[in-house]
Amino acid sequence: MHFIDEVKIYIKGGNGGNGCVSFHREKFIDRGGPDGGDGGRGGSVIFRSNHHLNTLVNYRYKQHFTAENGENGKDSNRSGKSGKSLVLDVPIGTQIFSEDGNILFYDFTVDDQSFEIIKGGSGGLGNSHFKSSVNQAPRKRTEGEIAEEMWIHLSLKLLSDVGLVGLPNAGKSTFLSVVTAAKPKIADYPFTTLVPNLGVVYVDDEEFVIADIPGLIEGAHQGHGLGDKFLKHIERCNVLIHLIDGSSNDVVADYNTVRLELELYSDYLKNKIETICLNKCDVLTDEEIQEKINKLQKATNKEIFPISTCTNAGVNKIVKLALETIKNQK
């Protein structure tokens, strides 16, 4: 299934049905009074979050959605049926914006939330409403209300507790596959991950969700590489796990490249709690590991955790630390 996280769609509520002009007809009664019924209300447009969905692909190829119109009123004071509301399911994490993106209408953060974005049009009045002492046989009725229509922008931000960040080929996808049952595409070349991957980490009787996004490169916040499109998917997380390729010749430069892109993208990411991991330590000597840890500690003033996603060394410690951080944030 394609991962789609941005779409533009057209929505319209159902129009109200027209009121009816009718007069009572009955044997032996020459001039029955007005008995035109009211039109039915048009259907509304409602969005609903659904935890079974994780992409907006359903709105990629079909872009126009209209609720059902209300029926016209009938004789014998019978009202027209109301139109069916249109319910559109979206993944948790979906945000509904105006077409230009300047107005946020709603943000779905839990399952089964509903938001009525357009109300159906009111039904028109039948001629029975207009009978008076001076007009016993009115032919007046009103038309149903025309419902609102609009183009809107849907944007999906995945919900996760932990976000994995790092340069391409830092080992994020391997880390995700080791700690979860997720099966991301993994290979030894940059940009293996082309879409965000989610996995659930189980620690004893507790769990949390972790997200791996495509690797960041310099200029990602401006659209370079793939990362800028997907950085939004880690804005909601509680903690970042920053993986650094231990086999790199300049681990400090690698760290600073990613860190700068996070800070330039948004204050949300800039202020996230960060756990820094020196990965691929299985290909380094103890002396090389310590040397690179010392350089990173000096540059970041933070604790550096040596790990290997190939041998699993140090990985469990990071998982437990992430869980503890998440619990402290809630």
From Swiss-Prot:
Q: Which domain of life is it from?
A: Bacteria
Sequence positions that bind Mg(2+): 173, 193
Instruction: List localization entries.
Output: Cytoplasm
The residues listed in the UniProt record as binding GTP, with positions renumbered to this chain, are 166-173, 191-195, 212-215, 279-282, 308-310
Q: What cofactor does its activity depend on?
A: Mg(2+)
Q: Which residues form the OBG-type G domain?
A: 160-327
Record keywords, A-Z: Cytoplasm, GTP-binding, Hydrolase, Magnesium, Metal-binding, Nucleotide-binding
Which SUPFAM superfamilies has this protein been placed in? Obg GTP-binding protein N-terminal domain (SSF82051), P-loop containing nucleoside triphosphate hydrolases (SSF52540)
- Which GO MF terms are attached to this record? GTP binding; GTPase activity; magnesium ion binding
Name residues in a coiled coil. none
Subunit info here reads: Monomer.
Show the PANTHER family listed in the entry: DEVELOPMENTALLY REGULATED GTP-BINDING PROTEIN-RELATED, MITOCHONDRIAL RIBOSOME-ASSOCIATED GTPASE 2
Membership in a protein family: Belongs to the TRAFAC class OBG-HflX-like GTPase superfamily. OBG GTPase family.
- State the protein's name: GTPase Obg
